Amino acid sequence: MNPLGLFLIYLYTCALTPVSGYPNGKVTSACRSMRPDHGHAPQSEPIHSINVEKTIFKPGDRIKVTLSGSRFDGFLVQARDAENLEGSAVGSFSLTDERISQLLTCDGIQNSAVSHTSKERKLQVELFWIAPANSPKHIQFLATVVEKYKIYWVKIPGPIISQPKAPSIAPKIPSSTIPVVPPPSLSLHKRFNSAGCGSSKFCIRNPVSCDPEHNPECFFLSFRKDGQSVLVEMSGPGQGYISFALSHDQWMGDDDAYLCVKEDDGVQINPAYIRGRSHPEVSSMDVLRDVAWRLEDGVIQCSFRRNIQIPIPKERFDLGRSYFIFLADGDAKDGLLYRHHRQPLMTNRKYCITDFPEDVGGSRSPLIIKLHGAMMFIAWMTTVSIGVIIARFFKPVWPTSSLFGEKIWFQIHRCLMITTVFLTVVAFVLPFIYRGYFSKRAGYHPHLGVTVMILTVLQPVLAVFRPPPQTHRRGIFNWTHWATGTAARIIAVAAMFLGMDLQALDLPDPWDTYTMIGFVLWHVFVDLLLEAHGFCLLKKAKTMEEDQIGILNSSPDEAEGHTFKKIVMTVYICGNLAFLITFLAAINQL
């Protein structure tokens, strides 16, 4: 397989990184509730059990605790005061197998909980609990067990152990083991439509002005204000889920999100909160009502109603304010969300969805990334290509013409190359401004970009130290200058091929690749044509007598050759600009 194919497979593999819960077991955020944010109700009847080696203990005792049952992926074990199961963890644990279990600090108490280290399947976990000096009279062990993402049990009650002579106690049921009944959801009988967009409801559509009733490829999100609540309708093609988020800025993080996840023959609808670039933290559905969904021909549709203002929790934003709005889709399996494989659709500014109804579009590429791509295309498709051809083939065309004290071909070449350096430097900085760091998910593209940047800066530095034409070092400079420039151009083209299909600037496939191949072939063809033309002129000159060579400089053949070069150059520039405008127009449409 060719390197480009391998790279695309690598990108696809990276794109399928799951945004799951905590496969590494670092679940300190769930210490008190012991509940994973998986967006599914826990199972009611536990199939796992907790056993202890003795039921009477004294402070300082070391008691063996065993969690066992059918195979499971993750777990969280704590000991709590049996008379206050909603309180803090009590005591500390030690491990018997650090390969599958790890100690956590909960409620500021070191080693007071134990969790898994990976998603490796387990049948049994053995631990030792150490009773503290100020231990309560009765201790009960609790365990949360995750069999797979949407199948888990919360606070499975274990045996109660007591200190000597402590009065008997009746077992209590932990609150999280009480089954949570989600609000009922209805099945939508017909598709959403765009009627009322911009007049009675706020709409976001991509492609612009598409109608989800007739176009299955339409990504559609609408908000209809109804008193103190808002009715939300969301539709789009999706293999696993579609979602939208309200954000204070144009970057992922600290966002109020809503997920519609395909599960078997239905759709699970949940609010969520996104902290930084981590996976969504699924929240309770209590804030949503009138939940409904529809699945048909690969299109996911869901609707729900929520109040404009929800004081608690704070993760639910006030819909009376303005936000950037994101609309994303991606894969999901067994309720497990995977990272979206393309850039989310995003509004170009903040909107208040409960203010005046509007009908807007969006972009899947941030403006700053569009500028990056546009500048790189201009620099490495047009300015550098024309500049190189001028330097290689047009020195004899204007042998005596000068501009500001330098030969005209050199001034044109220098102007185009300075423009290339300027555009490259500015474009190089833009992704770092947007990301804030060196992207690890962009494959080889950023590495090639850094290489191009180094070579681009090196070229004018070399030019400053260019030796005079008559010195022997001029030949070394010429070869070094040519090799550095050629390497930069080849690597830049490779970087453009890879960059066109990255998430942040995903140009339409497969025409983007074919168009870039067309540009490369066009440039190579013109380059070879001018090279062949020059070779023919040189061969013709060598066949002439020695006394005729001096006449060649002013012969009709030479003038005809110059005219041919000018015609070819004019046609080349027109073709080059056609390719460039095609790419710039595609970027503008993102």
UniProtKB/Swiss-Prot annotation:
Domain of life: Eukaryota
Domain Cytochrome b561: 334-533
Residues covered by the Reelin domain: 12-179
Subcellular location field: Membrane
Topology in the lipid bilayer: Multi-pass membrane protein
Annotated InterPro entries: Cyt_b561/ferric_Rdtase_TM (IPR006593), DOMON_domain (IPR005018), Ferric-chelate_Red/DefProt (IPR051237), Reeler_dom (IPR002861), Reeler_sf (IPR042307)
Cofactor: heme b
Family statement drawn from the similarity comment of this UniProt entry: Belongs to the FRRS1 family.
Protein name as catalogued: Putative ferric-chelate reductase 1
Species per Swiss-Prot/TrEMBL record: Xenopus laevis (African clawed frog)
